[in-house]
Curated annotation (Swiss-Prot):
Keywords: Nucleotidyltransferase, RNA-binding, rRNA processing, Transferase, tRNA processing, tRNA-binding
Binding positions (phosphate): R86, G124, T125, R126
Subunit composition and interactions: Homohexameric ring arranged as a trimer of dimers.
Name of this chain's protein: Ribonuclease PH
UniProt-listed InterPro entries: ExoRNase_PH_dom1, ExoRNase_PH_dom2, ExoRNase_PH_dom2_sf, PNPase/RNase_PH_dom_sf, Ribosomal_Su5_D2-typ_SF, RNase_PH, RNase_PH_bac-type, RNase_PH_CS
Function in brief: Phosphorolytic 3'-5' exoribonuclease that plays an important role in tRNA 3'-end maturation. Removes nucleotide residues following the 3'-CCA terminus of tRNAs; can also add nucleotides to the ends of RNA molecules by using nucleoside diphosphates as substrates, but this may not be physiologically important. Probably plays a role in initiation of 16S rRNA degradation (leading to ribosome degradation) during starvation.
A GO term, aspect molecular function: 3'-5'-RNA exonuclease activity
Any one biological process term the GO annotation gives: rRNA catabolic process
HAMAP family: RNase_PH (MF_00564)
Lineage: Bacteria, Pseudomonadati, Pseudomonadota, Alphaproteobacteria, Caulobacterales
Reactions listed under catalytic activity: tRNA(n+1) + phosphate = tRNA(n) + a ribonucleoside 5'-diphosphate
Species name: Phenylobacterium zucineum (strain HLK1)
Family: Belongs to the RNase PH family.
Length: 238
């Protein structure tokens, strides 16, 4: 039995609330149970130096946790003077995931920066961030199309992410913090709306896990991401 009493194949309650920041070109508050991530997508004219003159844009991401996102207050990374390795890993993952479904040439020499700030953490912050980031990016690119800033829709497909793990010997979908902390194995899956793989991160935490267990986790992920893609479409109006 899961601590939350959910069935093994059941997501936490998920909401993707849009328009939560009046200034950003696109914004979303992604809530997966008690995990809440505020995402904004902002247009910046110009691109990083390595892309100048190449006629294409860029999508990048930044990720951070508010000091009281967890049970005890953590120091702001800015106050420490450097980002943790975890932060750098997660924001690179978010950026890669978004770029996998964007036609960068359609942006011209412009950059969209997607900021993902964890307001409250109860497991699955990176997967919630990716799922909400696509919503914010979709809204931002639609705004740019409507304003005539770009002429072609750069969004090629949806992308969403979910965690799965082996908990008490059972493959389960969408781990909360208690499950994640006690999982025998866990994995993060990033898939497109078409079902293509963008990234899989899988780790045996307390033991190795079998190919059959991995296939069970992958099947759960496909089911969960299918449901998340439906919620993304509903949040963005199709």
């Amino acid at each position: 039995m899961r601590p939350s009493d959910r069935r093994p194949d059941l997501l936490r309650p998920v909401t993707l609330e849009t328009g939560v920041n009046r200034y950003a070109e696109g914004s979303c508050l992604a809530s997966f149970g008690h995990t809440k991530v505020l995402v904004t997508a902002s247009l910046e004219e110009g691109v990083p130096p390595f892309l100048r003159g190449k006629g294409q844009g860029w999508v990048t991401a930044e990720y951070g946790m508010l000091p009281r996102a967890t049970h005890t207050r953590g120091r702001r990374e800015a106050a420490q003077g450097k980002q943790s390795g975890r932060t750098q890993e997660i924001q690179r993952l978010i950026g890669r995931s978004l770029r996998a479904v964007v036609d960068l040439k359609a942006l011209g020499e412009r950059q969209i920066t997607v900021d993902c700030d964890v307001v409250q953490a109860d497991g699955g912050t990176r997967t919630a961030a990716i799922t909400g980031a696509w919503v914010a990016l979709r809204l931002a690119t639609r705004y740019l199309l409507e304003e005539g800033v770009i002429a072609t829709d750069p969004i090629l497909d949806q992308v969403a992410a979910i965690s799965c793990g082996v908990f008490s010997g059972t493959p389960v979908l969408d781990l909360d913090y208690e499950e994640d902390s006690n999982a025998e194995a866990d994995a993060n899956f990033v898939l497109t709306g078409a079902g293509d793989i963008v990234e899989i991160q899988a780790t045996g935490e307390k033991r190795g896990f079998s190919e059959a267990e991995f296939e069970a986790l992958f099947a759960l992920a496909r089911k969960g991401i299918g449901e998340l893609c439906e919620l993304q479409r509903a949040a963005t109006g199709g």
